[in-house]
A protein has these predicted regions:
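Metal-assisted phosphate- and nucleotidyl-transfer catalytic regions
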Residues: 9-117
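Extended C-terminal subregions enriched in glycine
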Residues: 121-128
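Residues at structural and domain junctions
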Residues: 2, 35-36, 126
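Catalytic palm subdomain of template-directed nucleic-acid polymerases
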Residues: 1-7
Length: 128
């Protein structure tokens, strides 16, 4: 199941960063790095994410096949404010924008079972 894959991948990212905070907390503090917000990671389809960008930030990218770097920054800001999470997972990018080996969603083949995991405005994991 795609959802199970996302559970594992999000879990790996969270665990990795929790260990980093535990083992390197003093160094992170020394450099003024803010503690990571580990709230429940919201999952949005690309279209849902673009709707949030439109409603919350006033940019209409709803016909685009991907997010802009500013979209990624803003979605992470939204996630932190609304969900107390520095992470957000974006799924279901258009099949036409992905490599041929990306699995189409059986429920809607126009979209793929692909994901980007964003952390503080940066795509840190991606796959299908």
């Amino acid at each position: 199941e795609f959802k199970d894959l996302l559970d594992v991948l999000e879990g790996v990212a969270v665990k990795m960063l929790k260990i980093m905070e535990e083992e390197c907390g003093d160094i992170l503090s020394e450099f003024g790095i803010e503690k990571i917000a580990f709230g429940k990671i919201p999952r949005l389809t690309l279209r849902e994410a673009q709707e949030i960008i439109f409603k919350e930030f006033g940019r209409d990218n709803r016909k685009e096949k991907d997010l802009t770097p500013q979209d990624e920054i803003d979605l992470c800001q939204w996630s932190k404010e609304k969900h107390k999470s520095d992470f957000v997972t974006i799924t279901h990018f258009p099949t036409s924008a992905k490599p041929f080996y990306t699995m189409p969603d059986p429920k809607d083949p126009e979209y793929s079972l692909s994901y980007d995991l964003l952390f503080r405005g940066v795509e840190v994991m991606s796959g299908s």
